[in-house]
Amino acid sequence: MTVISVEKMREADRYTIAKGTPSKELMRRAAQGVFDAYPGWDERRVLIACGPGNNGGDGYALAEIMKDAGLDVTLLRVSEKFSEDGEFYYRRCVEKGVPVLTFGTDDVDFSAYPIIVDCMLGTGFTGEPKGPVAAVISEINIARELNGAYVISVDINSGMNGDTGESELAVVSDLTVSIGYYKTGFFEEPAQKLIGALVNVDIGIELPEEQG
């Protein structure tokens, strides 16, 4: 089992892309890995909460995969911003008719979704979540505690520090699907109250020091 820091993960991402793997392909692989990691997708409604960066992009790519599989998936945009790759997959979702809600504009009944996927803040986030993201984190945690929603965090629980496991406010998950490599923060004491099951999916990201 390989465990690396957030900065090492960034370096590995850059290295893999520089060697010729397109970033959109890595995002697609991440989404497919999340889809394959959870065997419980069924006819139940799924809400995917997406933030502004590549973590949100993973959510958009996952929504496309789920739509293609005939599943009942809805996107929740928590930010008006996109990463370049995220916007690419968002547009594909819209073209395929995936329902899209915008937090703060549309009414969102979190209790209506038995499965909620957290794709808001990635491993690069530090500090305390603010604004709509903080509000959605709280709503997800309430839905899990009071309504029994099954919560899946993609790559990391939104709000958690990837190196230390610490958080001011973070999503509590039933399953966290790490992408590429486990991050050091997952195994620190503060993270234990946030993470239920933990799995990692290999999407072909190479560590620079492995090359010689």
Can you describe what each PLM-predicted range is?
Residues 1-49:
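An N-terminal, well-structured beta->alpha segment
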Residues 1-4, 10, 16, 113-212:
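YjeF_N-associated NAD(P)HX repair module
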Residues 4-7, 21-33, 57, 84, ...:
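Conserved active-site and cofactor/substrate-binding residues in soluble primary-metabolism enzymes
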Residues 22, 102-104, 109, 161, ...:
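Short, solvent-exposed coil/turn linker segments
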Residues 35-122, 128-154:
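Nucleotide and nucleotide-moiety/phosphate-recognizing core
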